[in-house]
Structure formats: C-alpha cells, structure tokens
Amino acid sequence: MCGRFYIPADDSDEELQRIIQYLNRSHTAPVKTGEVCPTDTAAVIANSRRMTPVPFAMKWGYTLDGRAPVINARSESAADKPLFRDGMQQRRCLIPARHYFEWERAGNQKIKNAIRPAGSEAMYMAGIYRIIGDVPEFTILTREPGQFIRHIHDRMPVILPREATKDWLNPACNALEVLSAAVTEVTFTPLDGIRQLSII
C-alpha cells in the first residue's frame, strides 16, 4: 500500500519545483510538502476542462461516512468497483513525489523505509479522483510489489515511467494497458533512528 509519501519544498527536480510553486501561488492554502499523510492537501496532476494536464490541490483519501478515508485502490480490480469505476474511466491523475514510505517489521519494531524508482529524482504515482461538493479527493492505485521489496510489504503504489504518464491522463487509453507499464525496479533505504514500536 502507500500510506505516506514525500515531496520536498525545494526539490532538485525542476518539474516538481514548478508544480509546487504553481499551486502555492494560485491557492490560498499551500499544498503539503515534506512527509504527506492521508487527509493532507497534496499536489496532483490532472486534466483541465480543456484536457490539458494541470497541477491541482486535492485532499488525499476518499471520504466515507463512519469509515477511515480510502487512500488506496487495488489497480487490478478498481475498474470493477462502483467507488472507483468513474475515476478509472474519466478521472485519472498523477501524484508526484520523491519517494514513498513503507514500514518493515523487525522483531517488536517497525523500520521506516524510503522507497523510490532506481536512478530517478522524481516519481509519478497513478491515481484517480472524485469531487464531493467542491472538494476534490484522490486515492493512489496499488499493485503487487517488485521483487526487491516483497519482504517489506505485499503491495506498492503504481509508479509510472514518465513516458506513460501522458497516456494515463488520456481517458481514451486503456487503463490496464497503461498500468502494465508500471515501474517495478525500486530501491529502498532504511531510515536510521525513525522507528515505531509495533502494537501487539
């Protein structure tokens, strides 16, 4: 799954910098940078009404009465679920980040790992969104993990190579075909000193 990701305020990747700066200029409340958590307002790329990719500020997680926000959707079955079907067909988005975090069990502790595509400064996670009232909400699609991180978690976000990002935002392109191009070769870095005790 993906329950945390990271996008620095001052990123060496020029494209990420432009996205954050654009949103912070055009919105009264800045988007979250640093470690982004569920329900935070984050930077998301989606099509405008003119079908042009544009940065938007969206809340992370589909809000459902009496339940925790839905922050992830399984890419393999999302198109068949009423909650996600419209998003898969018409409301696709990209969530830019430097890396995402996942916790690995180690005895009675959990070790926090930063995970990112090998040799990449920025990554783009595939997502879908909806608008409730006037609030846009997004969820991140997940898939089976690459072989190098299967020991950490049994799911990972769908990370698209840059050449597939344009197709993902194009509703005329088959969603599952685009998602099949997802990046699976990732690296992980344990973050020393950042650990959480397991709840037993």
Question: What is each model feature region?
Answer:
Residues M1-I200:
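Short linear sequence motif anchored by a di-proline
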